[in-house]
């Protein structure tokens, strides 16, 4: 209830939350570095909570061709460098998914234009707050196993700060981003489900705490 939320807030967030004239009055997304949301990662069974350390670790692993898991707005995603054949092949092994195409998270709209054909309507959809996956005709290849035998590519743009922070540290134009579950299994939503399905298959899993 609102009382529980109130008790867990820092003084600054609490003041915004209870002041009727404040634009954040009883707003669900009231947040700060103290109250969260916050990320943590499990790496070699060690819990890492420093955000800069999390970013540096995940960026290094992605550069090295590893597959990582990260919780999105809903469930987990499996992520790798979309240019790395080694990484995408490894992702297919983890997913047990031979031929189905993967969706790709691009750095920005300029890089989308480098790899696919897009018109104004499609770009407007890509840039909208909903950040949908838009199926577009491919212009040039990323790793060939991203969408084997296909002439189209599922494209989307960053919709979380974590995505933009990754691209600031990486030189790749795009990351493969697919649901964090093994084929025929339901999508992983909780850390426990991610651990059960992905243990031993990936080096690190990122989880955010969006709610108190």
PLM feature segments, named:
Residues 12, 34:
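Short, cysteine/histidine-rich loop/knuckle motifs that typically chelate Zn2+
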Residues 171-210:
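Internal gly/pro-rich beta-alpha loop/helix module
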Residues 27:
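Flanking scaffold residues of small Cys/His-coordinated metal-binding clusters
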Residues 67, 75-138:
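A phosphate-binding glycine/aspartate-rich beta-alpha loop in the early core of alpha/beta enzymes
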Residues 8, 30:
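Cys/His-enriched microdomains
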Residues 124-126, 131-185:
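Divalent-metal (Mg2+/Mn2+/Ca2+)-assisted nucleotide/phosphate chemistry catalytic cores
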